[in-house]
Amino acid sequence: MKCSLRVWFLSMAFLLVFIMSLLFTYSHHSMATLPYLDSGALGGTHRVKLVPGYSGLQRLGKEGLLGRNCACSRCMGDASTSEWFDSHFDGNISPVWTRDNMNLPPDVQRWWMMLQPQFKSHNTNEVLEKLFQIVPGENPYRFRDPQQCRRCAVVGNSGNLRGSGYGQEVDSHNFIMRMNQAPTVGFEKDVGSRTTHHFMYPESAKNLPANVSFVLVPFKALDLMWIASALSTGQIRFTYAPVKSFLRVDKEKVQIYNPAFFKYIHDRWTEHHGRYPSTGMLVLFFALHVCDEVNVYGFGADSRGNWHHYWENNRYAGEFRKTGVHDADFEAHIIDMLAKASKIEVYRGN
């Protein structure tokens, strides 16, 4: 009887050890597959769960980013000290209109089509399908290398660039974004000579070197039809004004500004001040969403309070501070707020 009890107890003990071993193995395997980081690797006292985000992997709670997501001295994804910025910024909206986001939300479609209403309506998706047979229709900014620093210069057209001597500094950036006319020849010392991105609409378009990306800012379906025509048949010569029938740009570098991103800026950032944001605002927020570091040149008035373009000799030629289309004062306020939030560096010029 004693022998039987001893055998029974030994059997139970072996069974218990076997069950505990199974439980430990299962628990260890399950923990290894969960999206957590071990506290030892972080030098902390808690496990940290990772969640997907536009700027990289982020730590839950108030500790900020788990790690730097770029190699710049400051990164767009760095922990923000500005609740204002965090409440406005949405990294999930792509600034580029592509095959993947062709279908606009109904409210965006209605708003965009009213910017420059046309007598004849067009099926936007059909127009885009034809356009994307000519230009890539892909998002070139989808992936970011955290080991690199993508420094971007957003160069406006303000007269405060005259005599600034910013040219060499501007040219040192990875991306140099300009808009509309923006001549560089003869102004290299102040505005730089390099351009990587040129933002234009049909009525302001000009030929570009092969190494420059043409970013079309469309206000209507006809603008999409125009760029397709200008890169092929040359049939469209007029929108609401004469336009170039043919355009010499690199087809592989043509990008289309996303109307949903356009409206996001109008709703979240400029808050419906003016009918829609200025081209300068559109380019600035494009940069904020694709760059690691953003430096701003040539925005606002000059040191005398005059609003004009750097290629104009008449300092009073550009009195556009507040119109029915744009509210330059409010946009200047947004730029100041972004600078205070350490999201941009603003170079005021002369």
Curated annotation (Swiss-Prot):
Upper taxonomic lineage: Eukaryota, Metazoa, Chordata, Craniata, Vertebrata
Full protein name: CMP-N-acetylneuraminate-beta-galactosamide-alpha-2,3-sialyltransferase 2
Subunit (UniProt): Homodimer; disulfide-linked. Homodimer formation occurs in the endoplasmic reticulum.
TM region positions: 7-27
Disruption phenotype: No visible phenotype under physiological conditions; due to the redundancy with ST3GAL3. Simultaneous knockdown of ST3GAL2 and ST3GAL3 results in markedly fewer offspring and impaired nervous system function at weaning. Knockout mice show reduced nerve injury-induced neuropathic pain in response to noxious stimuli (hyperalgesia) and to normally innocuous stimuli (allodynia).
Pathway: Protein modification; protein glycosylation; Glycolipid biosynthesis
Enzyme class, broadest EC rank: transferase
Residues glycosylated per entry: N211
Coiled coil: none
One example of a Gene Ontology biological process annotation: oligosaccharide biosynthetic process
Membrane topology label: Single-pass type II membrane protein
Induction: Up-regulated in DRG neurons in response to nerve injury.
Recorded effect of pH on activity: Optimum pH is 6.4.
